[in-house]
Structure formats: C-alpha cells, structure tokens
Amino acid sequence: MSRRYFGTDGIRGRANGLITPELALKVGQAAGLAFQRGEHRHRVVIGKDTRLSGYMIENALVAGFTSVGMDVLLVGPMPTPAVAMLTKSMRADLGVMISASHNLFEDNGIKLFGPLGYKLSDDVEKQIELMLDESLDKKLAQSASLGRARRIDGVHDRYIEFAKRTLPRELSLEGLRVVIDCANGAAYKVVPEALWELGADVISIGVEPDGFNINKECGSTAPQALCAKVREMRADIGIALDGDADRVILVDERGHVVDGDQLLAVIGQSWKEDGRLAKPGVVATVMSNLGLERFLAGEGIALLRTPVGDRYVLEQMLKDGYNVGGESSGHIILSDFNTTGDGFVAALQVLAMVQKLGRPVSEVCHRFDPLPQILKNVRYRSGRPLDDSGVISAIQDGEKRLNGHGRLLIRPSGTEPVIRVMGEGDDHDVVEEVVDSIVDALGNAAAAAA
C-alpha cells in the first residue's frame, strides 16, 4: 500500500495545507486507538517546537486523543529526543512531537513515538494510515471515559539531568567558551541552561523564537551566523542544532564546519579506543562520504550503510547490535543513551573528548578529508527514466570509470518526481563528467517520455 500521509519522519507538510486541525484531530484519534493496549489508564506525552502553527496542532491533537479516552501530558517546547525520553520515563503509551524539524515556519509535522521512545515501525504507521481515511465516530469514548489534559512542569530539568548523566560525573566544561545556536527552536531554553550547569562559558544565539523565525538563517542548516560568532568571540567551539534539536553540526575555533560524517568518525574512533563500541562498526546512510568509510576502515571499524533516514539507521543498529550511527546531516544516534537522534547529547560527547585531550576542536574533529561529492537532480513528468537503455548504459559506463576510486548513487525521490544522481571519488573532474553523463541520459529519457 502506498503511504498518503507518513513519510520517512512522520507526517510533514505545509501548516493549513496538508497539516490541518482536522488531520491532527484524526491523527490523535487514530494513534490513540492504536495504542490503547491493556486495561490501564492510557496517556500520551505531547511536545512541540516554536512554530506559530504549533498551538493550533497541539489543541487539535489534544481533542483527538481525549476523545478516544487517552490522557494528555503537555510539555511545551522541548527537543524531540527529550519527548522520546519523557515518553518512556513517564510510562506513557505514546509520544508526539509537533515539528517539521529543519524546515522553515510555514511547515509543520507530527512525529510519533511508541512507549519505549522509538519511532513507529512501518507496520504501525500503516495501521494508523488506514484509520485516517475511515470514520471513527463509533470508536469514540463514552462521556465518562473521556481523557484529561494537563501541562507538566519541571520537564526541562528532567532533560538537563538526563543529558548531564551521559558524561562522567567528574567532567566539567569549565574553561571552554561555547557558542550555542538553538535555531530559535525547541532547545532555546534547555540547552544553554545545561551547558551553563556543566561549567561552560556560554554564548547563545538563535534563542529568541517568535513563531516565525525557526531555522531562519540560523541552526544546523544555516551555520554562517554561528561560524562568524565563533570567530568574533574567539570561542573554542560552536554548536548548531536544528529546530527540534535532533540533529547537530559543530564549528571549530577557526569557524570551520564539522558535519555529521566527521562526528561519526571522531565518536567512532574514540569509543573504539575506550572500549565503548558495542561492535567494531558504525551505521550510516548511503549518503555518507566515502572518505568516512575509508577512515573507519583504517581504524578497524566497518561502515554499514542504510537507506536515507535516521529511522533506518536506528533499525540497523538495533537489529545488529551497534551503538553508534547517524547521517551526514547531523542526526547522530548513540543508543547507549537515546532511542532517537539527539544533537545535544552527541555534542556533549565531543566536548568531553576536547576536555580530555586538551586539544583544539580543529584537531579533534577533522579526522579525514571528504572526497569530492556531486549531487544533481533530474525532474521528470512521467514514465520510468531509470529503465531507459541509454540511462542504464550511462550508469554502467560511470561505474567502470569510478571502479575502486569512487561510487555512484542513483535513486528516485520518495516525495516528488525527481531522480537524484550522486557521485563521489578521488578525482573531482572525473566524478563531474560521470554525473553529467548520467544526468544528460536521464534528461533525454524524461523528454522522450513527456
């Protein structure tokens, strides 16, 4: 069955476009019914980021959940990993995060977590999808069995203590000047406070949300302001989170960006040296740079690749027993601590290494030189361009040219009629020629089918 609502990270779209109060109400009802297992009083934890539309969606979800007899615990603006943690810690049946992650304020979304804090499986999402398109009137709770809603105080302190406990008790960040960019998003209160409690000299930007400025020229997808601030303040490190704080990038003392691949390299190598890797491997997606794979191989660490999406990374980690994984975009999953990506916890592990080694971030975090990588998109109207003989031939020729010196990844988008062509290798010019050849072939095939 094709999925109409759920993508790779919950339901996401334009507020009052796809994401309407009516849809949120129905999601609350359907998810509430799907997770009413057992005879106990059922409850759901709901958090959100700082988008203007969060109020509208939150109220609609509350109406949906309470109408099927589920109690609602509202925690307000909180990082996605905090909502996952609270779902488990508060013995809830379900967790919900209202966020469109790194998107701008016009979009919003609904992420769902099971009782142990993990994102839902495809099968459970399909079960909920089926209910979204049917009438649930006959399944609503009786008047005396309706749910209640209440706001929970003190949740910021719970997450701060959780994050601090991922570091050794004796470790302090005293002496480190840290610039934190919270993307005007969900972490704007809790993360600067946690860094201060750990002893860092904290300079905060992206901590003045107004409902409209989440991820706007700030955060992990737009680190230019952070890079400039680190240089201006002569800071030791910059940390950039996205709107819901499940991804992170760092900036070294020179103002240079450290992406998710470099973070996987430094954490993977460090944890192997300390005997903390559950198995000699790290899980990443097909988009991670070949330079990461080569670096890890030199350290005796395998790189396992999954489809794009942090949920697939986590599935592989749980299936095969790995405890470090992530994406080049900055979703870092450390399953010793988290059930989902946690940008702040990942950053703390690197800060701990910087303190332990007494070396600048530029030396600690730049473990390999990324190979040149070129990504191009080809839009098409109809047909199956990847089945065209000219395209197949161009791909085969490209693979021969890159054999042993690079790789190709050609995949259709899951959300729009676009073919994504990615090539990387030791020689930039060769990679560009290979990618352009495939793009030209795809363009010809798309034009012929139009």
From Swiss-Prot:
InterPro entries (UniProt xref): A-D-PHexomutase_a/b/a-I (IPR005844), A-D-PHexomutase_a/b/a-I/II/III (IPR016055), A-D-PHexomutase_a/b/a-II (IPR005845), A-D-PHexomutase_a/b/a-III (IPR005846), A-D-PHexomutase_C (IPR005843), A-D-PHexomutase_C_sf (IPR036900), Alpha-D-phosphohexomutase_SF (IPR005841), GlmM_bact (IPR006352)
UniProt KW keywords: Isomerase, Magnesium, Metal-binding, Phosphoprotein
GO cellular component terms attached to this protein's record: cytosol
Enzymatic reactions: alpha-D-glucosamine 1-phosphate = D-glucosamine 6-phosphate
Active site residues according to the UniProt entry: 101
GO biological process, one term: peptidoglycan biosynthetic process
Gene3D superfamilies membership: Alpha-D-Glucose-1,6-Bisphosphate, subunit A, domain 3, Alpha-D-phosphohexomutase, C-terminal domain
Transmembrane intervals: none
Single GO term (MF): phosphomannomutase activity
Record note on modification: Activated by phosphorylation.
Cofactor field: Mg(2+)
EC code: 5.4.2.10
Modified residues (Phosphoserine): 101
One Pfam family named in its UniProt record: PGM_PMM_III
Stated role: Catalyzes the conversion of glucosamine-6-phosphate to glucosamine-1-phosphate.
PANTHER family: PHOSPHOGLUCOMUTASE (ALPHA-D-GLUCOSE-1,6-BISPHOSPHATE-DEPENDENT), PHOSPHOHEXOSE MUTASE
Family: Belongs to the phosphohexose mutase family.
Protein name: Phosphoglucosamine mutase
Protein source organism: Rhodopseudomonas palustris (strain ATCC BAA-98 / CGA009)
Taxonomic lineage: Bacteria, Pseudomonadati, Pseudomonadota, Alphaproteobacteria, Hyphomicrobiales
Name of the gene: glmM
